[in-house]
Structures are given as C-alpha cells and as structure tokens.
C-alpha cells in the first residue's frame, strides 16, 4: 500500500535548504517508518522554484519557525535541490514526486517576493479582485499570497512551460497544488470578462460585475444575480481546460509520469475557487443549487492519474 510523505518547502527549509546530509537522513527515516513515496514541494507561494529552469528565479530564502521564532532562512547552496531528493530517493528505493503551487506569483513576505513584485511587465497576470471599492489588483489588497489570473493565456503558457522543465527530472509524479482561483472575488479582470462574454455567446454584460456578483461579496448571496451560476460554470471550465493542457505538457515530455492534484475535500463550497474535482459523471446540479446542468462537464477527475 502506498504511503506518501509531503515535504513542504518552507517548513523544512532550515533542515534541507543547504544540507544534502539532512535530506539523506530524513529520507532514510521515512523509508524506515514505512513510507513508499516522497512528495517534494519545489514551488512555494512566492512562485519562485527549487528546480532548474530559465523561466523564473530560484528560491533564495524562506521564512520558517525555528523554535518560537519566525526566522528568515537563506539558501546559500548552489546544488540542485530537487535533484538531491531524486538522487537520494532512488538510492533508498523510494518513489519521488514533485509538487508546485500553481497559480501563485508572489507573497507579501519580506516586503514582497516573487515574479509579480519583480517584473512590472507581468502586472496583467495578477488576479483582479471584485472588492467593495471596485475591481482591484490583488497586489493592492491585503491578500498575502498573490495569485495569478488562471484565465490569462500567458499565465497558462508560462505554467505549462514550467511543468515541461519539471517533467525533465526522473520523477514518478507531479502534483499541482493551488490549481485554482484565489477565492470567489477572483477573477474579474477584463480578460476574464471578455472570455466569459464569449462563452455566453457574445453577449455584453451591461451591469458588470453586479450581474455576476456584487462588489465586495465574498460568499453567495441569498438571491443569485443574473449570470452568477453561469459564471461559476465558466470558472470551472477555465480550470478544467488548464488541467488538460498541463497534463498534456507533462506527458509530452515523459508519458510515464503520473499527474495529480492537491485539493480541498470540501466539495460543497469548492465552487468558490473555481474547481470541480469530481468525475464528469457526477451531476453536481442534482445536489447543489449553485451548479448548472453543465457544471458536471468540467469535473476533472479523469485528467488525473
């Protein structure tokens, strides 16, 4: 029976960032404890990475709890973090998987870290939030993790290219975490509006965003605005379509790599992040009034191994 251990990047950075010896020690302990599979987080919420790619910067530091202190841990080592885990896992006879935080591009930590803080040309990639004050870039909100707009074509291409680089490693599997919208208030960019209006057959929404969701609303209202349920359906399609592309990107490099996701189990409210992780045979609309009859078509379970 497979037993997985998930190695979060930040929490384990003090031990592993600069020490192959500690990686070897803990993988031996994991094997001894009966684990069969190691999952290494190689793209934390800053959106920088711990594997070789030319597409984005390497993680230079993380914050982690050391005793009772939240401490900045710098990575001074230049060896390949993921490759060290792969080498040791193979030595120990363990299966090895990599996990990425997907639609993230920055974190408020240290005054702002990550692609969305460094590269102003990517400002349009940042998700646009439906706030009380109006539609606002996530960069100008208190949200600590700065999400991308999952519907933006350039974002999807960037992430698929990143996954191709990741699939070049000797991995058994790749997991996508945070493969979702930030929350119900995202994404209300002009890009998402344009795509939604096309999806609806070329209509023009006169009262935007109110005909979908009132500004500042962070949960479903008692009475649904005109286009709300179709909007939830559209968002599920955006994520479904991306997962198909991401799978194709990974399998195109290495057909044998397993492709999977990390999701929240609270299906009944997971519409708020635009994800239908059920099988397409499960008719969500039979059980929940927020789901249209087409919502089930975007259940992505079949994309996963």
Predicted regions and their residues:
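Aromatic- and acidic-residue-enriched segments that line the glycan-binding/catalytic groove
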Residues: 50-63, 104-139, 179-218, 272-288
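Substrate-binding cleft/loops of secretory-pathway carbohydrate-active enzymes
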Residues: 105-108, 184, 243, 252-305
């Amino acid at each position: 029976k497979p037993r997985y251990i998930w190695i979060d990047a930040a929490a384990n950075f003090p031990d592993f960032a600069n020490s192959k010896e500690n990686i070897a020690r803990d993988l031996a302990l994991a094997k001894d404890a009966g684990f069969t599979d190691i999952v290494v987080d190689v793209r934390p919420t800053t959106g920088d990475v711990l594997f070789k790619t030319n597409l984005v910067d390497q993680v230079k530091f993380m914050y982690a709890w050391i005793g009772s202190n939240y401490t900045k841990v710098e990575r001074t080592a230049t060896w390949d973090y993921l490759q060290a885990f792969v080498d040791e896992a193979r030595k120990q006879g363990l299966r090895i998987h990599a996990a990425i935080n997907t639609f993230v591009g920055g974190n408020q930590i240290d005054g702002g870290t990550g692609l969305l803080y460094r590269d102003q040309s990517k400002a349009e990639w940042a998700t646009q939030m439906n706030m009380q004050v109006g539609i606002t870039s996530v960069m100008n909100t208190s949200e600590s993790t700065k999400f991308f707009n999952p519907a933006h074509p350039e974002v999807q291409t960037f992430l698929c290219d990143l996954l191709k680089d990741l699939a070049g490693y000797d991995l058994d599997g790749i997991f996508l975490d945070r493969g979702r919208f930030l929350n119900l208030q995202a994404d209300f960019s002009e890009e998402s509006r344009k795509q939604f209006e096309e999806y609806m057959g070329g209509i023009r929404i006169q009262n935007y965003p109110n005909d979908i969701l009132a500004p500042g609303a962070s949960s479903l209202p008692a009475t649904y605005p005109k286009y709300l349920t179709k909007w939830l359906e559209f968002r599920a399609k955006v994520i479904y379509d991306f997962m198909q592309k991401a799978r194709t990107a990974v399998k195109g490099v290495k057909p044998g790599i397993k492709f999977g996701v990390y999701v929240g189990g609270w299906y009944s409210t997971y519409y708020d992040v635009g994800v239908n992780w059920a099988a397409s045979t499960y008719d969500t609309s039979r059980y929940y009034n927020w789901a249209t009859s087409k919502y089930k078509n975007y259940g992505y379970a079949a994309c996963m191994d």
